[in-house]
């Protein structure tokens, strides 16, 4: 089984997130995608974070595909660092092929994530296009450091069966929605 792991604060989740999830399912040939709502992001201000239960409920509303499973198991782990979460997932699911899925807008700060190189070494990564990030991803520290591990987009369907480090950039339909903009509009 091939499973995409799509983690984030989803504060709030929106149709742009659903588009990334659907694009990953289709282009990577995944059997499932686990939409992992994190209890908190160490790189973001917790003062503006909606309650976890609210973010889970909203995620379930917009993740309409039955192959998308919304989960918040990081809370049960007492964990909010992706590298550690991925280690636990791998240990508990030895027979599953995983791909870490992220929007291209996260790539510019990916090198600031705790143990980001360990994340790259744990599972293959699919970076899905987002507005304003199409060309910028090439200059990101991760793209430069792992340029030799880049898989051609035409071979994205093989990513789950490759050994890490391996990554690809997937072009496709994009949504201009952003959680930051939605929060600003709601408070302003």
Swiss-Prot record:
Alphabetical list of CDD domains matching this protein: NMNAT
Pathway stated in the Swiss-Prot or TrEMBL entry: Cofactor biosynthesis; NAD(+) biosynthesis; deamido-NAD(+) from nicotinate D-ribonucleotide: step 1/1
Top enzyme category: transferase
Keyword Nucleotide-binding in record: yes
E.C. designation(s): 2.7.7.18
HAMAP family per the UniProt record, alphabetical: NaMN_adenylyltr
Name the UniProt record assigns to this protein: Probable nicotinate-nucleotide adenylyltransferase
Taxonomic source organism: Rhizobium meliloti (strain 1021)
